[in-house]
């Protein structure tokens, strides 16, 4: 059996460097990883997915694929439906699978649309998004306020009192029918991928298809 390639997909207005520490951890554990910075603020989700699909196919060929995604990266992977992509397992970190309440509240704001672009506006409505192309797990953060997450102290107050969230995405927004595993961790949205608890869960799912006990 060919060795799987782990695709790391960053979130909106981020770059591949945001996944670097997680990628280094996975490589030390014996995995081969691939990531790149894609222009998340310039294009629609479907366009970004189409472009990434071609690049992944060129690198991976017919190898089995795993993915670890952050935030909008999870929505991108839901759109990576090209049959030439041989997905096996996916782990989504803080994905707005039900759409983003924050995006919905700000989608008509010209500054929001200018900064976050077409894809940011699309995060307001999840009704047309396809199901993930492989078995998948979801990890949600619950630390609603953190200095490292600017959104948490500028827009996080838009969440109703008592709604668990990571400062950017509500826990309930991360859930999706069909997920094989779900976990909550004490982490904020921006750097959830660097949490030791998240690393442990990701490693277990990629190796065994299940979160460790």
Predicted regions and their residues:
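Helical cap/lid subdomain of alpha/beta-hydrolase-fold lipid enzymes
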Residues: 3, 82-213
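Serine-dependent carboxylesterase/thioesterase catalytic core
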Residues: 6-17, 21, 25-135, 156-158
